[in-house]
Amino acid sequence: MKSAEIELKFPIADLNGLQAQFPALGFQLDTPRTFEQNTLYDTPGRTLRASKQILRVRSYGGIWTVTHKRPAGTAAVAEEIVAPAPRYKIRIETETTVEDGPALGEIFEQLGYAPVFRYEKFRTEWSQVTGSIDGPLFTDLALELPAPRPRSHLVLDETPIGDFAELEGPPAWIDATLAKLGIDPATCITESYGRLFLAWKKRTSSAAENLAFDEIPTGAEVLQASFS
């Protein structure tokens, strides 16, 4: 399935306190806290990264998913949605489930791609009915989208380097949700977990190569506690 993804992240200081607000705001719990592991693939010359694309294989709740993401790439999108740019992260996402993630990874490697980065987290998924999305963004991109998209999403990610929330939905809904949760828009970010990891490595001088619980001591403690 191909779709336009509009999202924004913000760091969380008190995950339980934030999550306690969700039911009163009309959010529904879709997926309880679940371990997620992601592997990014690229060429030896990092051609995907250079063009701001990702190729990812994800394991989440016993389901394997392959995803390709690329920039939206049209001036019309930027003018319509991002004010001021780059307020939101906007990408085109093509995604589908697969039966055997490791086998798909082997296929990628035979085609010249290699695993270049692994990142892990515990994710909790919530959603809220927000109606449908329409307008110039989706017309200009000429995407084959179903007419209604009734739910927008708020996910909580517990990573080895900290907790983050991610809002995905129409820009107006994102802004309204931030206000209802009391989140300062100035604290919001659009960086990927890969870039957040690199910034963390620079600050801490860590030798870790992946955003993984087994490579980051504090993360390893979280992992052990979660499965004990």
Question: Model regions: which residues?
Answer:
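N-terminal strand-loop-strand beta-hairpin
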Residues: 1-149, 187-228
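A generic beta-sheet turn/junction motif
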Residues: 59-61, 160, 171
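Active-site scaffold segments
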Residues: 95, 166-168
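Conserved residues at beta->alpha junctions
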Residues: 12, 168-169
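Short active-site-adjacent structural elements
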Residues: 165, 175-176
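Short, well-ordered alpha-helical microsegments
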Residues: 15, 174-175
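A contiguous pocket-lining binding segment that forms or flanks enzyme active sites
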Residues: 154-161, 168
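A hydrophobic, small-residue-rich beta->alpha segment in the mid-to-C-terminal subdomain
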Residues: 172, 178-189
